[in-house]
Amino acid sequence: MKKLFSALIMGAAIFTLGSCSSKNSNYVKIGLLHSLSGTMAISETPVRDAELLAVKEINEAGGVLGKKIKVIEEDGASDPSTFAQKAQKLLSEDKVASVFGCWTSSSRKAVKPVFEQYFGLLWYPVQYEGMEASPNIMYMGASPNQQVIPAVDYCAEKIGKRMYLLGSDYVFPRTANRIIKAQLVQLGGEVVGETYVPMGHSDFSAIIDEIKAEKTAVIINTLNGDSNIAFFKQLGLKGIDSSKIPVMSFSIAEEEVNFIGTDILKGHLVSWNYYETTETAMNEQFVSRYKTEYGNDRFTADPIEAGYIAVHMWAEACKKAGSFDVEAVRVAAKGLSYTAPEGTVTIDGNNQHLYKQVRIGRINENGLIDEIWATPGAVKPDPYLSTYEWARGL
């Protein structure tokens, strides 16, 4: 990994990005790259909205280094190859200073070589499966030790150790479940079933019958996008609610809860680092601003908050560097702390992930999430799970 960092950093001397869009103008360009159409639009559009709110706040406060931010937006269309094409356009044609975007690990992995080739900088706002660290990506979401592992520990202790693993068929669910299976061996638990479905899949009847037949204690859900709508609705039609078989989800937050319906989701569990109900002074301001901008019927959520703070942390790193150049900003971001709605977060200089507090929540009847467990403070990111004996060899 260190060799990769060194090789890519050397590329910065040959291909310096960011400053070329801002030296001779009164604005600096950034790119927003999210799925505004397709199966992932339900989740990614609100993240885009939060990033635009952050841009508005920064511009109203005078901009960054005397320049206003100009947004160039592209639609990844829920397709990894489209994400890669749009990333190349933003970097090589639009010459943006940084890009904020992606959700699925498939889209992130599709754009990763593009950012490394053009020495751009992606600020990635979503929890993921770990096992990665690129000098050209700032990871604003949780690594597995800040979401998945604590959630499985909680379920094993509080609910039961017979777990059914259900996920979309792509990188994050498969890698997360590989981690979970190793963890359950250490916990003395059992995987009673493991199923992956294509993105956008909508028929879960046979899978739910299997879940019931296996006397499952808890379902570990790594479905993404609108498949969650079909799954939870069909779960309810089969007579399964949170009192019978609770579901622990890693990609459902407040926006999805209120789209799917609280009558179906109430009582089920989620694991994140932030909720709309998180009690900090900064969060009160953030929630108020977000609802003022987009309406009281909208909700904040973990990836939304991560997208919001990503833009603000980029701006702070630019100020610290005195430059928009990618390498200068990347170096300035190391060790940077920011008072976020979730609490103070800090960029780990070794892997460009955030220190984050872990919070497990239960969905309530009002469409919000009540925190029921949390770590005492921010947890150091460990994307390669180097501190877990049972994870060696994964």
Named regions from a protein language model:
Residues 4-5, 11, 17-394:
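Extracytosolic ligand-binding ectodomains
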